[in-house]
Swiss-Prot record:
It comes from the Bacteria. Belongs to the universal ribosomal protein uL18 family. The keyword Membrane does not apply. SUPFAM superfamilies: Translational machinery components (SSF53137). InterPro entries: Ribosomal_uL18_bac-type (IPR004389), Ribosomal_uL18_bac/euk (IPR005484). Part of the 50S ribosomal subunit; part of the 5S rRNA/L5/L18/L25 subcomplex. Contacts the 5S and 23S rRNAs. One of its GO terms (cellular component) is cytosolic large ribosomal subunit. This is one of the proteins that bind and probably mediate the attachment of the 5S RNA into the large ribosomal subunit, where it forms part of the central protuberance. HAMAP family: Ribosomal_uL18_B. This is Large ribosomal subunit protein uL18. The lineage of its organism: Bacteria, Pseudomonadati, Pseudomonadota, Alphaproteobacteria, Acetobacterales. GO terms for biological process: translation. GO terms for molecular function: 5S rRNA binding; structural constituent of ribosome.
């Protein structure tokens, strides 16, 4: 039987393939969540470029003294990625939550991005 890491990699590739097939050429809003921080990127897979990104590791957010591991930080990142995406000319995206459940920080980021002007 395949190793656990190999199975996770296969699942990750399968999810990416499904997203690309259903995206219809729209950029992808990718979310990465760690135990201490959350990151979001708007990626154009056709060109292989990152159009906008936001993270709790950015200097302005770190200087505020807040942790990046809570729902309020995810909400700030969601609004920030939406603002930067709209500035880059992106209105519609495909939400790529990876293997994370649509709950908690991931849900807060998605809802804040919708409020900020992105549609998915």
């Amino acid at each position: 039987m395949a190793s656990q890491q190999g199975l996770q990699e296969r699942r990750r590739q399968r999810l990416r393939f499904q997203l690309r097939r259903k995206s219809g050429g729209r950029p992808r809003l990718s979310v990465f969540r760690s135990s201490k921080h959350i990151h979001a990127q708007i990626i154009d897979d056709a060109q292989g470029r990152t159009l906008a990104s936001a993270s709790t590791l950015e200097k302005t957010l770190r200087d505020a003294g807040k942790t990046g591991a809570d729902v309020s930080a995810a909400t700030v990142i969601g609004k920030l990625i939406a603002e930067r995406g709209v500035a880059a000319g992106v209105k519609t995206v495909v939400f790529d939550r990876g293997s994370y459940l649509y709950h908690g920080r991931v849900k807060a980021l998605a809802e804040a991005a919708r409020e900020g002007g992105l549609s998915f």
